[in-house]
Design a protein with these regions (language model features):
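N-terminal presequence-like segments and the immediate start of the first folded domain
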Residues: 1-75, 81-129
Length: 129
């Protein structure tokens, strides 16, 4: 069975030619999220890694919610940081608040050269229904 692609009403289109999420065999793959305001996508990004991490995770929660899922459905996360050495600890502090208790998905975190709109962080994930 081919994947199902989700374009979610009320959310801005992706900055790339992609869907908000794709689903196959009970797995939901979220397109990378960053710190833009989903209700005002042209607004400036928040300042600093803490604020951008909060917004990024809130965006993930919103996309998952539109699909009937929660953060507890997440099995795997990939985090991309443009200032890895500088921002890793601060990002982790915010991240840990969103994945408290038993919800501890597998995670990869890498440093990258650049992200869309000069974002400091981008996160994508795989969730399971």
């Amino acid at each position: 069975m081919p994947p199902k692609y989700h374009l979610i009403d009320g959310l801005p289109k992706s900055v790339s030619p992609s869907s908000h999420a794709a689903e196959a065999d009970g797995f939901v793959f979220l397109t990378g999220q960053f710190g833009r305001d989903l209700d005002n996508p042209d607004a400036p990004l928040p300042e600093g890694i803490e604020a951008q991490t909060e917004r990024t995770l809130a965006n993930m929660r919103r996309v998952l919610g539109a699909l009937g899922l929660t953060m507890e459905n997440i099995a795997s996360v990939r985090v991309f940081l443009t200032q890895f050495k500088r921002d890793y600890a601060a990002m982790n502090a915010v991240y840990a608040r969103h994945f408290a208790g038993a919800a501890r998905p597998a995670r990869t975190c890498v440093g990258v050269t650049d992200l869309v709109r000069d974002a400091l962080i981008e996160i994508d994930c795989v969730a399971k229904r």
